[in-house]
């Protein structure tokens, strides 16, 4: 019975029940009725019809009711199945809605915080604007006050100007009247001169041109030495003239003239003039340096001060006129003329300025000359010139002194003009002083206004600071209360382990007692969020532990109380059996099977403490899912018998599996015999079954060695030198002869002519991937690399020690290629100085970390690769660098072991000077260095050849092919202590080319086009790139943060040119070139789940979740969820639900190889699922499913895992030619060869191993004749051979037990003589399968 339903996602759910139809049920009832009818016939034949006459209707009624009840029961069971599916979907929907609600609440909280922050910012802006408004109002008020003061000053100046103008008018009138009086007095004295000289010109004589007008010429000549015509006396300077002057004015006249000059100076400030009035006349207020002003400047000043001239005081003007007239009179030379002049002066009181002092007319010495300080000249020179000119000149002057004439006014005005010009100059200087003082005053007023405004601003800021202080105090109180509440919640959350709760409470009490409340640290919002996040993480871990404990208890209960595997009889049969049986006693109870005490360890408890400290959960080396505890009352033989009985139950369950085909150690579905009618096609299908070709412990001598990880060597893009084949150098132990044959394909045939190597050479893609496999193992003290050839897995090629810590991951990196990203793009646009010891930058959330120098080949010695470096701060001994290259003498040294201490040699001081400095970020150095282990025996003189190795030749002294450079293929190893090691994959394997200490444990490594992405346990990605010379540059790398440091990046996978990273329950899709996260999506609805494995092929990526048995398929481009496959029902069906804990299935290894999906579980079970072709969908409806070999919807009975969830892909019609790796559990194949513990890894390498290699084939080809086809037939069909290796602890054959029975001891052969059987079964085993497939 098949039903098809549409689920909510638009997909199709196909159901197929295993119940019999209604017709089958009726046949059962009819058979029962027939038997009852025959029994009634016998009764009637023996007795009579009356015996069964009343019984017959009752029996018929009972049978009819039985039929109806059976049919109803079947319907109820179908409905129950549908309701269960609906319940699962509703639970999924509920989880999704719950997650969405949680996200909505988180977004609401974020929006609320953002709005509150924005509100605070707006409030701050409003306060700032109010403060600016108050400041502008204050400035406007100050400007209004300044305008009012300026207007008042303007009105005062207008009044002063009017007063000066009126005074100037009066002065001119007085001056005109004075001139007229003077002219009238001189009319009588000049009449005789006019009569004696009638022909004299009425114009001014030319001899007086030495006295120019009031333009400052004479004044400009004061500063130098003036030599008049016919004068032998020299004027040195103004000081000499002043000192030699014998003419002194009275004290009162000088005071009067000083007061007049002060009165003529306008002063708006109300202060007294600084003009000295004690010893000099009014003209003495002019300083000496200003009195020596040039002629041009004085002329310009005279023109500009025209208005100032009009404001002169009339009294001062009268004094100047009197002085002018006197000075003119003094200059006469003869005694007769001097007497006339003296009479005029005596008759005019206004001209007699100094009545007490008379000049000595006989004195002609310059020492007796008069210094006219009003004009600043020596009057003696004027007198001497006038005396030498003669009396005619005086007559001409008197004759031309006509008030109404043109020249008379000019002659008489000469002295007055000089005095007026002097006063104008003084006035202009005083005006300039006044203007300067006004400017200073205005500046002071503006400064006062500014200071008052700043005072108001500071007052406002002080008020705002006080308010903010009050708010912060309130906030501090609130935070203290919240801190108390959070601490109490933290104590409650940590109260599960009582000791931890006591420690926390005591710690909190002591800390709170020591630090006062006012000095305690104030929590920010980020710190509170971190505290809440840690609390949630503790809750998640608690839930995981509870889940693991619950599983453990369930499994323990199933071990201690095994269910009886017999079919119970119905109550009706029991009723009839009691009715018709001869005896009424019940049958004896069947003896239950002997049980054994089996304790199943939780997968999370093994390394929980390490995961708590290092953010990772490594599987403990000594943990096994099954531990047998001995009973005190049982002997060893009894326990062995119980164990054999337990495995016999598993064997019976495996052999009694109906409809299954066993071939080559695999349990195959019955479809392989039913699909094709002809046998040839069936044989072709059977050839694709993986054939186990090898199963042995990895190293026979060391039983304590545990496997961790492995990787095949990728040699793509690397070619040795052409002269390597003919140079006569034997290949090193690290050089694989198979690789040499493949790489020299176009050269003559090599000396190695084994059939395996010939076949490997003929394959087209064998040059890209070698058959060598590097396997990481560890003991209690060290980690080692074991190199094997998959074609000869029993032979160890080489092994060497890496470090003292566990190596968690390994990856093969190909050689440098032209398709790699350019190394310059790694730095983007950042200006990073390569020589700067602290060069680091942040590029869009990406931190650039650099070392001290960008050394092209920073090869550190192996001694720095222990748990901690030997030298301080991670500075190991490096090769000598000369001109940017490594010294060849240093590069050819023998490689030492990982834990060897370097022997100091004579070149130690030279290398010590060239050591690179420590990393720029101190988090990369070990804060507490511990001494590394001492030198190991046999490691000082180079690598000691292993006893199991078949190539004991020493290593060559040089590397002619350049394989020792990191530009060739390399192997990258990541350790638990954070060290990253780079070794060559082609030669000199033991030598470490590069090493670097990272912040946390290295969990995964991938390579994409010249970029190596390293996943760390603190949630960050370290991205490395090559240098300009093609070698890897570990000194400069980028750190990309994906989340909180409490969660680790568990796995990574390369999908085309992108990298998928598993972080918590999310998958981040990263572009390595731009170092940006392109897409993030949830792989599981529960946040506490973790993505553990990723496997990519075609357009699909398979994802596994921790503690989950369901595989999820996602589209590589659209990231759409395509399919779910649950392997737990399949494993339970194949191995039994209660046998050996196989009902608890967790996926620990995942690989896509040979067109198959390989799944390894935590119980050591290996499952191989063939991949199917693309599902063709149209509008979300299933139109067809074309399988590679079979169809999951074919008419086969219901199988575990047959319920396939197929989700619609809208873009599938656009990419119809792409391959999406769907798979169906109806085609799943389970291998009977497994491990005792979890499957640690799967590795796929090309190779072709003959089925009869040393009896290593686990299952005879007779069990499955298909895989033993001749090689020519395989090559004729263009099949591709691949070897798949699995590694794990111990070995179990589920058909015969875990290898401790007698059959295993007999099959072991000579191996049973080396170690006891029990220890051999617990050693680390590798199992190798060969798969032949046709590539799509």
Swiss-Prot record:
Effect of residue 578 to C: In NEDBA; affects axon development when expressed in a heterologous system
GO molecular function: JUN kinase binding; kinesin binding; MAP-kinase scaffold activity; signaling receptor complex adaptor activity
GO cellular component: axon; axon cytoplasm; cell body; cytoplasm; cytoplasmic vesicle; dendrite; Golgi membrane; growth cone
Region of interest (Leucine zipper-like domain (LZ)), ranges: 423-458
Region (Interaction with NTRK2) residue spans: 458-514
Location of the region described as JNK-binding domain (JBD) in the Swiss-Prot/TrEMBL record: 209-225
Quaternary structure (record): Forms homo- or heterooligomeric complexes. The central region of MAPK8IP3 interacts with the C-terminal of MAPK8IP2 but not MAPK8IP1. Binds specific components of the JNK signaling pathway namely MAPK8/JNK1, MAPK9/JNK2 and MAPK10/JNK3 to the N-terminal region, MAP2K4/MKK4 and MAP2K7/MKK7 to the central region and MAP3K11 to the C-terminal region. Binds the TPR motif-containing C-terminal of kinesin light chain, KLC1. Pre-assembled MAPK8IP1 scaffolding complexes are then transported as a cargo of kinesin, to the required subcellular location.
Name recorded for this polypeptide: C-Jun-amino-terminal kinase-interacting protein 3
